[in-house]
């Protein structure tokens, strides 16, 4: 390997659109925007009062959640996570952040909570139950289970932990995604 002069390196990086600041940020962040660190919370149950989110609103929310959850900001990686979460959210909640579980199952239990639903009912875009949301809450996001970014980020954290899916969409990502598409849609 031949040494390169500092000026030549600076020119090379500049032509690639890399600044010393962005290179330093990437090196210090491991290539992600957020750390994806979990922060246990007692979820708030405050509905947003909004209807279904538009595709553009979902794209922004998924990107912010991916940033917080430590998903690398790589076009191919983000495209895979976006496709997965657009599909998952459409089937889980119909793109409605205030959705409460309608299917009677083991989660549909507990005393009536502040939002009128049983305490353990699944809520939000990704249909997170409060205990799972609280245990997989991503630091830096809202502690409100109905907040779109917080709900998606907690879901991503849960998927990465429970199903051993790597943030870079490597190990187990394709298997997890294929299982969601089985029979039209299979929940997680």
What is each of the regions a protein language model found here?
Residues 98, 102-138:
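Substrate-binding/active-site groove segments that recognize
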Residues 123-188:
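Catalytic and binding regions of secreted/periplasmic enzymes and modules that target cell-wall glycans
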């Amino acid at each position: 390997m031949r040494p390169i002069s500092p000026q030549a390196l600076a020119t090379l990086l500049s032509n690639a659109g890399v600044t010393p600041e962005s290179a330093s940020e990437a090196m210090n962040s491991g290539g992600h925007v957020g750390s994806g660190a979990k922060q246990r919370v007692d979820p708030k149950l405050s509905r947003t009062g909004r209807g279904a989110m538009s595709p553009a609103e979902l794209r922004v929310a998924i990107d912010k959640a991916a940033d917080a959850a430590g998903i690398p900001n790589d076009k191919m990686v983000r495209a895979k996570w976006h496709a997965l979460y657009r599909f998952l959210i459409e089937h889980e909640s119909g793109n409605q952040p205030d959705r409460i579980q309608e299917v009677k199952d083991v989660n549909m239990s507990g005393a009536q909570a502040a939002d009128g639903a049983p305490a353990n009912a699944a809520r939000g875009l990704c249909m997170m139950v409060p205990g799972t949301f609280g245990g997989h809450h991503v630091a830096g996001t809202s502690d409100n289970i109905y907040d779109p970014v917080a709900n998606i980020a907690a879901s991503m954290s849960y998927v990465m932990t429970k199903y051993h899916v790597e943030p870079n969409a490597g190990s187990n990502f394709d298997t997890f995604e294929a299982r969601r598409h089985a029979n039209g849609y299979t929940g997680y």
